[in-house]
Every structure is written in C-alpha cells, then in structure tokens.
C-alpha cells in the first residue's frame, strides 16, 4: 500500500511568491530612483577592478610615476667629482664617479639620465616639464661632498658651503616653494649628509641609510625611505652549503667606535680567542677589501655590529657573499621590509645577550648545515634588492618605495594648506614609531 502523498498548500505557496515578488519590486524601485548611480557605475567599477588586477600582474600597464630631475648647477654634481679628483677638467661630465659605500646617489642619478628604453621595469618615468611631474628629484652628490671635505683638509673645499648653496638654490625654485618641498626627493645616504641644512629640507622624502642622526621631526619611516648601502665586494657565485666555509664567524672592521659602537670592543675581547672565529681590525683599503671578500666567502656567519651608527655596508656585503648575517644592533633600520623578512636569512641577537661569555659561538654552533643552506637560498633570492647594478635591483625598488609615498605627500600638502601654523616649540612629525610596546623580539 502506497503511503499518502501530501499535496502542497497552494495558498501558502502563493503567499510566499507574492512576498518575494513584493520585496524585489521595492528593491528595484528604491535603487532606480534613489541610487541610480549604482547601476550606471557598476560596469565601470567592474572594469576598474579588472584593470587594477591586470596592472598588478602586468607592470607595463600601470601608470608610472612622473619624476622631474632638476638640472642642477654642476658644482652640486660633476663639480664634486672634479673636486674629488683634484684636477680641472674641460668636460666634467666625462668624469667617473669614485667608488664608495654611498654610491646610491650616483646610481639614482645615472638611472634618470639613461634613455627610457633602457629603464625596463622601472615604476617611474622621467619628464622634462616640471608641470607634469608627480615628484621632483634633487640629484646633489651630498655624500661624496662629505668625502671631499674630510679627505682634503685645507684644500679650499667646504661641504657646509655646498649645503647652504644647494638649499638657497632650491628655495629660489618655484616648484620647491609651491609645496614647501614636500613633493621633492633628496638622497642623503651618509648619516652626516646635509646635516647643516636638514631643518630646511626635512619636508622632502629623504633617502637615508638610517635615522640615527635625524631627530623625530626630521625623519620617519612614514615619510622617508631606508635605502641599502652599495656593497663593496663581489657577490659569491660558488656552491651553496657549508663545504667551502671553514670559518664559523667573520668580522673585520674598526674595533673602537663611539656611542652604540662600544659593543665592538667588548665582543672583540669575547670572540678573538675562539678557534674558528676570524675577528680582526681593519680600515678601508684595497688590500683589506680583498681580505674581507676572502673572509666572507669562506665563513658560515658574518657579524654585523653597530658602529658610530646602527647601519653599515658590511651587512649588504654579507648578503652578497651568502654569509648568514648575525646582527647585534638593537635599533637598526633595514631597507624594503615591506617585501623582505630579514628573519628568514639573518640571526638577530640582543646586545645584552651577545655580551654574555660564550653565548654567540654556542648559539651559532647549534645551527645545522641544512638551516644554513635555507638561509643561503633565501639570500640568493633577495640579494638583487641590494645590488645597484642589477636591472631590477636597488634602484627600481627605491623608486617603488618612493612612489608609495605619494598619497601621504598629497595628504600633507592639502592638510598644510588649510591648517594654522603651530608653535614650533613642540615639533610634530607624521612618524611611525615601531614596536611601541617595548617588547624585544631578538634573541
């Protein structure tokens, strides 16, 4: 016997259908008369989403940032190179920029002087009409100027005079005055570069290696860009692993430094007697550079200690050498941390922990060869970011970082124009203060 099949309640079904239809008609009525733009714009919104995805995946499609590079008087660029050489030249533009750890100013300048067809993958495009520019680049060789001044005392060259002259020239420019320099980009790689005039250029996006010599109202992670030193030794191209690396740890540099660099002398005393640790004094010279290359290429770990400032080119030499950096520098700032996680190829040690007898070598001896190999593989992937000669290296990444500042630049320009000037006795800066909790994440 078949069970009885219940017939649907037709009146209930009709009521549900009528209710759904009524809600739909009300929705259409409201959106048609009160929110018509939703429908008219939906196609463009959808297209914009597709366009943005395509731009993200295909770099050639996005709008490049337009950068105007000032045609500075030659005494701020090639004239500084001429002063470094000490001999007059009929054509200063033919002079070669001398090699040193702050060559970023040269690479950025030369990048903008290259034909556009050779700047493949760059997020910026150079424009020659300042009215078209999103940003303005000031190409003064401020770090080289310091070298010339300190290297030839009594020669008659003054870096401070160069700084004053540069800023006076800038302040006479219409485009600088328009927004108080906020849409300008200035490289000041050496910690003392532009120190005398920093208060007059602090509104600009500063390209710096650290913030150690800058006040909180002069430099910040929000406004400025941390850039890498130019590494001085050849990259390691040999076999990965520890087979060719007979030293546990390597360091070569000045033993005695001021302020935060005092940790060097203490660590020298702790480490110099360890049998497979190479730690010795040395200043910059061709002979010592060869010794550094040999030491870094044959060591598993390379020690990075704070000097007069927390940063140094030694870290980037280590990465180029695939020598695992051991960083003992509590306040160090590192470049490009939005795309690079340094913990994946570096070991960070707190200063107080590193100064405990036996702590450093004991910790490093526990790192297995397989772990070192993983560190090396990551370094090999990321080291292009620290190579100014790489087609998609430091230069492109610096421009990308600068481009990301544009929304903040526009915000600050508009905000400044409508706000009453505040009392200068309480300076404020749009500053990102990292790790406000005070929690220490190093070992």
UniProtKB/Swiss-Prot annotation:
Residues 1-15 are cytoplasmic. Disulfide bonds: none annotated. Keywords: Cell wall biogenesis/degradation, Glycoprotein, Glycosyltransferase, Golgi apparatus, Membrane, Signal-anchor, Transferase, Transmembrane, Transmembrane helix. It is found in: Golgi apparatus membrane. The chain crosses the membrane at residues 16-36. InterPro entries: Exostosin (IPR004263), Exostosin_GT47 (IPR040911). Glycans are attached at residues 75, 392, 435. One of its GO terms (biological process) is plant-type cell wall biogenesis. GO terms for molecular function: glycosyltransferase activity. It is a single-pass type II membrane protein. Its EC number is 2.4.2.-. GO terms for cellular component: Golgi apparatus; Golgi membrane. Probable arabinosyl transferase responsible for the polymerization of arabinose into the arabinan of arabinogalactan. May function as inverting enzyme using UDP-beta-L-arabinopyranoside. Cell wall pectic arabinans are involved in thigmomorphogenesis response of inflorescence stems to mechanical stress. PANTHER family: ARABINOSYLTRANSFERASE ARAD2-RELATED, EXOSTOSIN HEPARAN SULFATE GLYCOSYLTRANSFERASE -RELATED. Homodimer and heterodimer with ARAD1. This is Probable arabinosyltransferase ARAD2. It comes from Arabidopsis thaliana. The lineage of its organism: Eukaryota, Viridiplantae, Streptophyta, Embryophyta, Tracheophyta. The gene is ARAD2.
């Amino acid at each position: 016997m078949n069970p009885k099949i219940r017939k649907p309640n037709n009146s209930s079904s009709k009521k549900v259908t009528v209710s759904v239809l009524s809600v739909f008609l009300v929705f259409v009525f409201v959106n048609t008369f009160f929110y018509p733009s939703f429908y008219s714009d939906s196609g463009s919104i959808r297209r914009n989403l597709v366009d943005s995805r395509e731009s993200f995946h295909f770099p050639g499609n996005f709008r490049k940032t337009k950068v105007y590079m000032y045609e500075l008087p030659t005494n701020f660029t090639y004239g500084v190179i001429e002063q470094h050489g000490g001999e007059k030249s009929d054509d200063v533009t033919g002079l070669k920029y001398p090699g040193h750890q702050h060559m970023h100013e040269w690479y950025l300048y030369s990048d903008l002087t290259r034909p556009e067809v050779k700047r493949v993958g760059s997020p910026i495009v150079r424009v020659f009409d300042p009215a078209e520019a999103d940003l303005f680049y000031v190409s003064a060789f401020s770090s080289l100027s310091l070298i010339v001044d300190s290297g030839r005392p009594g020669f008659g060259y003054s870096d401070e005079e160069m700084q004053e002259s540069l800023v006076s020239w800038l302040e006479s420019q219409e485009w600088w005055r328009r927004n108080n320099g906020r849409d300008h980009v200035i490289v000041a790689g050496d910690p003392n570069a532009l120190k005398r005039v920093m208060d007059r250029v602090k509104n600009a996006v500063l390209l710096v290696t650290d913030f150690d010599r800058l006040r909180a109202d002069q430099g910040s992670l929000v406004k400025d860009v941390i850039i890498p030193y130019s590494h001085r030794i050849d990259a390691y191209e040999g076999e990965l692993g520890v087979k060719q690396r007979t030293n546990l740890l390597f360091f070569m540099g000045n033993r005695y430094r001021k302020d935060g660099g005092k940790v060097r002398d203490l660590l020298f005393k702790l480490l110099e007697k360890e049998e497979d640790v190479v730690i010795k004094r040395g200043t910059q010279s061709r002979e010592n550079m060869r010794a550094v290359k040999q030491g870094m290429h044959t060591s598993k770990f390379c020690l990075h200690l704070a000097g007069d400032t927390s940063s140094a080119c030694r870290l980037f030499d280590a990465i180029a050498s695939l020598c695992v950096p051991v960083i003992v520098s509590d306040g160090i700032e590192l470049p490009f941390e939005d795309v690079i996680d340094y913990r994946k190829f570096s070991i960070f040690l707190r200063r107080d922990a590193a100064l405990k007898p036996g702590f450093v070598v004991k910790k490093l001896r526990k790192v297995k060869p397989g772990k070192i190999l993983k560190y090396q593989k990551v370094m090999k992937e990321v080291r292009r970011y620290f190579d100014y000669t790489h087609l998609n290296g430091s230069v492109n990444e610096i421009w990308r970082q600068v481009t990301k500042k544009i929304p903040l630049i526009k915000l600050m320009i508009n905000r400044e124009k409508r706000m009453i000037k505040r009392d200068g006795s309480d300076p404020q800066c749009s500053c990102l203060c990292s790790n406000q909790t005070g929690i220490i994440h190093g070992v």
